[in-house]
């Protein structure tokens, strides 16, 4: 059965609310991070992050491009299709290959919807960069008591 490598950085991480979708997946690298600092991770305000390619986010001190921290899984076709459905690929999030530091490339889901990207660019107060750039789990720990 064909397998696909997927890098997860938000609600699909171990212990978070969408991780159950990976119940048949094999964890192959944790922690893991993207090889290049070319992403911006912001809080959606709804319990999950938006990851954008740096060129789709407004550059500012609070939104400097960074690597993304997460986990890499090996998934089958059916699980990849479930993830595509969750992420509304290709209209809401777009699945693309990205390099993983010290490892083989993996699929990643990046915010694609232009209206949402425009809202993120236009309202950094509503969509703040995560407290530790690229690290959703640390951000959750910092915001849990607020």
Regions found by a protein language model. Name each.
Residues 2-146:
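Glycine-aromatic micro-motifs
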């Amino acid at each position: 059965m064909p397998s696909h490598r997927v890098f997860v950085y938000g609600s699909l991480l171990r212990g978070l609310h969408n991780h159950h979708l990976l119940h048949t997946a094999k964890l192959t690298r944790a922690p893991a991070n993207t090889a290049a600092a070319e992403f911006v991770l912001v809080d959606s305000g709804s319990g999950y992050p938006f990851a954008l390619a740096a060129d789709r986010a407004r550059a500012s001190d609070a939104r400097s491009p960074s690597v993304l921290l997460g986990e890499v899984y090996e998934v089958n076709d059916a699980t990849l299709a479930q993830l595509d459905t969750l992420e509304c690929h290709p209209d809401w999030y777009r699945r693309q290959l990205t390099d993983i530091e010290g490892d083989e490339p993996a699929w990643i889901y990046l915010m694609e919807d232009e209206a949402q990207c425009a809202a993120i660019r236009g309202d950094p107060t509503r969509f703040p960069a995560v407290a530790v750039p690229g690290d959703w789990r640390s951000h959750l720990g910092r915001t849990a008591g607020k």
